């Protein structure tokens, strides 16, 4: 019986996900430990036009926000669809995971995940073209994330010329 009660009272929103930062400096155990104590969230699927003020307005509803770091294209130095939100307390971050993860911001469903802690340099996209890796391969047109994916944009002019003959 107690096993069933534990399952009912578990809070999957604040559990640590399977995702791990592949660039983390340290071993898996250290990363797990930091994630379980973290006050920092990675927030993805933001519009390229979402402002720091919009992020602050939403995420401050769950607790006192220490700082927000907007993700930047490492080449253009423009927003590229993600950010880090640091809270003063773990409780504030847990509330955001419970109540804000999966909600809409700037007409997009955002996703939040635990982060082991922001380190300088992580604000830049890791894609080959400077933005996020996921935007490199996207085939659909998404005006809030810069149109077509970077690789699709490179092939579009050739396809357009081929289709005119």
UniProtKB/Swiss-Prot annotation:
Gene Ontology CC annotations of this record: cytoplasm; nuclear cap binding complex; nucleus
Principal subcellular localization: nucleus
UniProt source species: Siniperca chuatsi (Mandarin fish)
Designated name of the protein: Nuclear cap-binding protein subunit 2
Binding site for mRNA: 19, 42, 111-115, 122-126, 132-133
UniProt record similarity statement: Belongs to the RRM NCBP2 family.
Residue segments, region Disordered: 144-165
Gene3D superfamilies, sorted: 3.30.70.330
Gene that encodes it: ncbp2
């Amino acid at each position: 019986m107690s096993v069933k009660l534990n399952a009912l009272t578990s809070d999957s929103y604040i559990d640590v996900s399977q995702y791990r930062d592949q660039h983390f400096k340290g071993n898996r155990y250290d990363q797990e430990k930091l994630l379980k104590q973290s006050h920092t969230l990675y927030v993805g699927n933001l519009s390229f036009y979402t402002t720091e003020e919009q992020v602050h307005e939403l995420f401050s509803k769950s607790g006192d926000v220490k700082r927000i770091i907007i993700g930047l294209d490492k080449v253009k130095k423009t927003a590229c669809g993600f950010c880090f939100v640091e809270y003063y307390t773990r409780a504030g971050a847990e509330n955001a995971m419970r109540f804000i993860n999966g909600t809409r911001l700037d007409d997009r469903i955002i996703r939040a995940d635990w982060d082991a802690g922001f380190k300088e340099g992580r604000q830049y996209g890791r894609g080959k073209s400077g933005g996020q890796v996921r935007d490199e391969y996207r085939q659909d047109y998404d005006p809030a994330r810069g149109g077509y994916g970077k690789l699709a944009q490179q092939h579009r002019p050739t396809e357009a010329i081929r289709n005119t003959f």
